[in-house]
Amino acid sequence: MGDPGLAKLQFAPFNSALDVGFWHELTQKKLNEYRLDEAPKDIKGYYYNGDSAGLPTRLTLEFSAFDMSASTPAHCCPAMGTLHNTNTLEAFKTADKKLLLEQSANEIWEAIKSGAALENPMLLNKFLLLTFADLKKYHFYYWFCCPALCLPESIPLIRGPVSLDQRLSPKQIQALEHAYDDLCRAEGVTALPYFLFKYDDDTVLVSLLKHYSDFFQGQRTKITVGVYDPCNLAQYPGWPLRNFLVLAAHRWSGSFQSVEVLCFRDRTMQGARDVTHSIIFEVKLPEMAFSPDCPKAVGWEKNQKGGMGPRMVNLSGCMDPKRLAESSVDLNLKLMCWRLVPTLDLDKVVSVKCLLLGAGTLGCNVARTLMGWGVRHVTFVDNAKISYSNPVRQPLYEFEDCLGGGKPKALAAAERLQKIFPGVNARGFNMSIPMPGHPVNFSDVTMEQARRDVEQLEQLIDNHDVIFLLMDTRESRWLPTVIAASKRKLVINAALGFDTFVVMRHGLKKPKQQGAGDLCPSHLVAPADLGSSLFANIPGYKLGCYFCNDVVAPGDSTRDRTLDQQCTVSRPGLAVIAGALAVELMVSVLQHPEGGYAIASSSDDRMNEPPTSLGLVPHQIRGFLSRFDNVLPVSLAFDKCTACSPKVLDQYEREGFTFLAKVFNSSHSFLEDLTGLTLLHQETQAAEIWDMSDEETV
């Protein structure tokens, strides 16, 4: 037992100081790296001995706590810790805190017994952090622990704490500052957690703990040690001294009767360095033999109410609402990667730039689904205004948008996306797309406007990765199909009937530098390996576009049509289905290692191993709502296609707007003559005549 006549030494415990940046980094680590992994993780904090009077003894964790190689702030001491992050609140509550404390305390005890703590004194200052992060509400539950080994008896004070300037002269204090700074520089650090210290009237010397035998050679009664002390109380040392005294008692109690302790505190006020508020006192080392078993340990932090329990921090109210929305948008997506689709590459989806040509029923639904996938860059193109019939079918508009003649759809859609999620980069362009069979040569003004529209569309397609064709008419899809094919852009097309729809990806032409005989990666697969269908194993560069099945050129489809024929009349749920499938098709293509060149999946592949983590990558999805059925046909590119055939692309790339103007101002026969469709019609008619002649002969 300690001497009953002597006062007992008491310590100021650490207070955890977890920065908002730490919780943000934990959120990112949980979503992107840890996921369901509850294994302990190494983290790092620090404490400081220069705080102003009145501040608690703090151990700080910042955003850099997860980077073990990150530098510690200047003049701060690092503290190594272990993070135990649970997946559920129940697991957090039922975690065996006693076992966690015992495990950490045993590590400290082993470092003391082996002498490793003399070589690396940071091993004496370890901490635990038990956490649960509710990433939906941004509530973070945590319980902090800084394990301290307990001596079998309390530590008696031989001489009570006094300030350093009461024990040392100004000359000695200045010599101490210089000696400490020199030792730090020699070790390549700005702070040392513990050091040896001896002084007389003329000199002050300091050294590392591992040199204690040589440093205190010849001393038999008392030694002096320095402790980097984060506490600023005049009568009490900080928590780091506790484990050091256990080390001293274990290693030196047989050699020395007492230890003089300098709690080194070093702060700068108004540009002047001051260590005089450091305290120095003398304690009696317990004379006892330690058993090999780890001593009892304490260290769990009390909560705000002063009881033994965890703490909770609610960051939902203080975080930037835009950042909060951005993190929440990504939450469900990143949860997919935890267990369901670990190989999902979300960066490919989030970073893709999408151009939506058409901001009507399909455009609105496609945009909402793109946002659900976390796509941050969406651009609308449309020339229509919002009418009173639109808001019930087009979810980006409301009644007020129809007033005063209606807002431009493209601009209103972009504005609404930013209101839904401020993190999206949404733009709208109120412009027309010139079309075959719709003349633009009425005047120089209309001709010049068409030229500007074409240039604008070319620039938009050039600046985006995926082009969605979501317009009302067939001919309005022709120009973007030609431009996108020439620029080798992925095109996703969606079109509606009354109770049918088609969603397809256009074939992606080979890069221009490749010759006709060059092989894309998909072509290296042997046809017999993936099925027996006639259209099995068609690589992406051989797939057809929206116009490849046509044997006539596109023209003015609205001329001489009644109202029900001019408007898109379809079952209300059809656009939602087709819009969602269009986006899902894009995502599946992006997840395929060959992207737009991926071999097309067909209905025959439904029972085969899917080529991506998300499943099949079809060429087309044709749906029949009356039968609640979908089929996945595949079609080859047509060498006489009026949009993507080599003849059309060559003419466009050589002549540019001159060629396009001919298409706009001419009848459909111009494209048919160019591509060879006219000759095909003539040959077909001739064959029919010969067939009739043969029948008459018979």
From Swiss-Prot:
Q: Which InterPro entries match?
A: Atg7, Atg7_N, Atg7_N_1, Atg7_N_2, ThiF/MoeB/HesA, ThiF_NAD_FAD-bd, Ubiquitin-activating_enz
Tissue-level expression: Widely expressed, especially in kidney, liver, lymph nodes and bone marrow.
Residues bearing Phosphoserine are 693
GO annotation, cellular component aspect: axoneme; cytoplasm; cytosol; dopaminergic synapse; membrane; perinuclear region of cytoplasm; phagophore assembly site; presynapse
What is any one GO biological process for this UniProt entry? nervous system process
Report the active site residues: 567 (glycyl thioester intermediate)
Superkingdom of the organism of origin: Eukaryota
Localization in the cell: Cytoplasm; Preautophagosomal structure
The cross-link Glycyl lysine isopeptide (Lys-Gly) (interchain with G-Cter in ubiquitin) sits at 41
Principal location class = cytoplasm
Signal peptide interval: none
Q: What keywords were assigned to this record?
A: Acetylation, Autophagy, Biological rhythms, Cytoplasm, Isopeptide bond, Phosphoprotein, Protein transport, Transport, Ubl conjugation, Ubl conjugation pathway
Q: Quote the PTM field.
A: Acetylated by EP300.
Q: Return the CDD domains for the record.
A: Apg7 (cd01486)
**Where's the motif FAP motif?**
11-13
Q: State the Pfam families in the record.
A: ATG7_N (PF16420), ThiF (PF00899)
Task: State the deletion phenotype.
Answer: Leads to hepatomegaly in liver and accumulation of abnormal organelles in hepatic cells. Liver-specific knockout leads to loss of autophagy, increased accumulation of CRY1, decreased blood glucose levels due to impaired gluconeogenesis and the disruption of the circadian clock in the liver.
Q: What is known of its domains?
A: The C-terminal part of the protein is essential for the dimerization and interaction with ATG3 and ATG12. The N-terminal FAP motif (residues 11 to 13) is essential for the formation of the ATG89-PE and ATG5-ATG12 conjugates.
Q: What does this protein do?
A: E1-like activating enzyme involved in the 2 ubiquitin-like systems required for cytoplasm to vacuole transport (Cvt) and autophagy. Activates ATG12 for its conjugation with ATG5 as well as the ATG8 family proteins for their conjugation with phosphatidylethanolamine. Both systems are needed for the ATG8 association to Cvt vesicles and autophagosomes membranes. Facilitates LC3-I lipidation with phosphatidylethanolamine to form LC3-II which is found on autophagosomal membranes. Required for autophagic death induced by caspase-8 inhibition.
Q: What family is it from?
A: Belongs to the ATG7 family.
Q: How does it assemble?
A: Homodimer. Interacts with ATG3; this interaction is essential for the transfer of ATG8-like proteins's thioester from ATG7 to ATG3 and plays a role in the conjugation of ATG12 to ATG5. Interacts with ATG12. Interacts with ATG10. Forms intermediate conjugates with GABARAPL1. Forms intermediate conjugates with ATG8-like proteins such as GABARAP, GABARAPL2 or MAP1LC3A. Interacts with EP300 acetyltransferase. Interacts with FOXO1.
Q: Tell me what this protein is called.
A: Ubiquitin-like modifier-activating enzyme ATG7
| Biological source species | Mus musculus (Mouse)
